[in-house]
Design a protein with these regions (language model features):
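Membrane-interface "cap" regions at the ends of multi-pass membrane proteins
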Residues: 1-27, 56-61, 65-87, 246-250, ...
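Membrane-embedded translocation segments of transport machinery
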Residues: 2-6, 169, 173-321, 325, ...
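Helix-loop-helix connectors at the membrane interface of multi-pass transporters/channels
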Residues: 3, 107-140, 243-248, 253, ...
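Inter-helical loop and helix-membrane interface segments of multi-pass membrane transporters/permeases
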Residues: 3-4, 32-36, 66-91, 104-165, ...
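Select transmembrane alpha-helical segments in multipass membrane proteins
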Residues: 5-16, 41-44, 83-97, 147-152, ...
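Transmembrane helix-boundary motif of multi-pass solute transporters/channels
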Residues: 11-48, 236-242, 253-256, 260-261
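Hydrophobic alpha-helical segments of multi-pass membrane transport proteins
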Residues: 320-326, 347-365, 380-414
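A generic transmembrane alpha-helix motif of multi-pass inner-membrane proteins
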Residues: 376-400, 422-451
Length: 451
């Protein structure tokens, strides 16, 4: 069966950016920026995005476009006879399943909060205990979380079952355009609040005193880690979209566009969070506490807060769901490519697997709340394995596969990367890609354990 292509370049860019843009852009990037010197951190982040993120992204896309296959078969198509690079393809699929085992339930939380703001569960004037109580009640109710999980899983795999152009590309285009419009509207509203200037200063103005306290080395390694992790590279989440590309555009140019969209959302998210928090005297933090406790506390005390809260969680639903359907597509393509299944059958099987695989994460907040390994609950443990092990190790494998004679080889990668119109990768960068970039990835890997 002939492989589908994206209907348009815009579709490819929005689907790929949707995969990269996710919860971390909102609940991690702004906080890490503020804590690490503001504007100076952003400059380091952008530098490492160019030095690390874009090159590895081109490698995933190159393997996909050259092979026209999903992760496992892409290695088998391009590797030398009797080599074992395709083992990493299987690890990529394990990583995608593991990522969705905790990411899908969290996407359900976003949808739940959108519903609760829209229907008036959050009322003007609620105190902080009442706001926290809504989140605590959700965490204590496996039934409620399972309902939202089921909605995300069913709708996500239904979109994938429709095919590339009629399903994921069509839906992602609508969601991403709406997401970009929503984030701009929300940022403008936040920047018009009373003490917005203080929040913007904390967020973006370089604070050399804070850099001195934190340590320049810590700022640099934090920027390096954020630039690496923001794209989710190493488990073939982007490789699959390379396999649907045509040869019209260079991969380096397309990678720059994807990273630009991802960075835009991450930076503008901070323009929502910090002005709002400083205007209402709330300490900005990170993670679930920021999204589900701190910001709802702001919204319930804001004029028109129900509307702004509804729009914010609609934005967060789109941000998380765009990643969900992108990775779901990888899982569906894995079964269709590797085992010759139809899209419908692959979507149904994956939907059943994913629903039950997500239950441990949900139960980890209530009936299995005593479970921990090395002090980590179910969600944190799954996140640690994906983020600190599978992503950096996987990125290193893609790097070695594309730059060494034992893998696909630099010349093949270079030719694929530069095929088409657009920005070209310079051959001068070969020594950097072969000898320096691996060292940077090792630093990220080590930093993940130290941090």
């Amino acid at each position: 069966m002939q492989r589908e292509n994206f209907k348009s370049r815009t579709g490819f860019l929005l689907v790929s950016a949707g995969c990269a843009i996710g919860i971390g852009n909102v609940w991690r990037f702004p906080y890490v920026t503020g804590e690490n010197g503001g504007g100076l951190f952003v400059l380091f982040y952008l530098a490492f995005l160019v030095l690390m993120g874009i090159p590895v992204l081109t490698m995933e896309l190159a393997v996909g476009r050259a092979s026209r296959k999903s992760a496992v078969l892409s290695y088998k198509t391009l590797e030398k006879p009797k080599s074992k690079w395709h083992i990493h393809g299987w690890l990529c699929m394990i990583g995608c399943y593991l990522l969705m085992m905790f990411y899908t339930p969290v996407s359900g939380w976003m949808l739940d909060y959108f519903y609760k703001f829209a229907t008036g569960t959050f009322k003007s004037g609620m105190n902080s205990e009442q706001v926290s109580g809504v989140f605590n009640d959700l965490m204590a109710s496996p039934v409620e979380m399972i309902i939202w999980l089921a909605i995300i899983v069913v709708f996500g795999f239904f979109v994938c079952s429709r095919g590339l152009q009629k399903g994921i590309e069509k839906v992602s285009k609508v969601m991403m355009v709406a997401l970009l419009a929503l984030i701009v509207i929300l940022a403008i509203n936040s920047m018009m609040l009373s003490n917005a200037g203080e929040g913007l200063s904390f967020y973006l103005v370089p604070d050399f005193g804070k850099v001195k306290n934190v340590g320049l080395g810590k700022v640099i390694t934090s920027a390096m880690s954020q630039a690496f992790f923001t794209l989710g590279l190493g488990i073939a989440s982007m490789e699959i979209f390379g396999s649907y590309m045509n040869k019209d555009r260079t991969l380096y140019g397309e990678a720059v566009q994807i990273c630009a969209l991802d960075t835009f959302v991450a930076i503008v998210a901070g323009l929502i969070i910090f002005p709002a928090c400083f205007s209402f005297g709330v300490q900005p933090n990170q993670g679930p506490a920021l999204i589900f406790v701190t910001l709802p506390n702001v919204f319930v005390n804001m004029t028109g807060g129900r509307i702004w809260g509804t729009l914010f969680f609609l934005f967060m639903t789109f941000a998380s769901f765009s990643t969900v359907i992108a990775v779901f597509e990888n899982l569906v393509a894995f079964l269709t490519d590797t085992f010759g299944m139809s899209r419908t059958k692959a979507s149904i099987i994956n939907g059943i697997i994913m629903f039950f695989a997500c239950l441990p994460c949900i139960f980890g907040f209530n009936i299995w709340s005593d479970f921990n390994i090395l002090g980590k609950g179910v969600l944190d443990l799954e996140d640690f394995v994906v983020s600190n092990l599978l992503l950096p190790i996987g990125a290193m494998v893609y790097l070695l596969f594309c730059t060494t004679k034992f893998g696909w080889g630099f010349d093949n990668y270079f030719e694929e990367c530069n095929t088409g119109k657009g920005l070209k990768l310079s051959r001068v960068l070969k020594p950097y890609l072969k000898y320096v970039l691996p060292v940077l990835i090792v630093i990220v890997f080590v930093q993940g354990f130290i941090g």
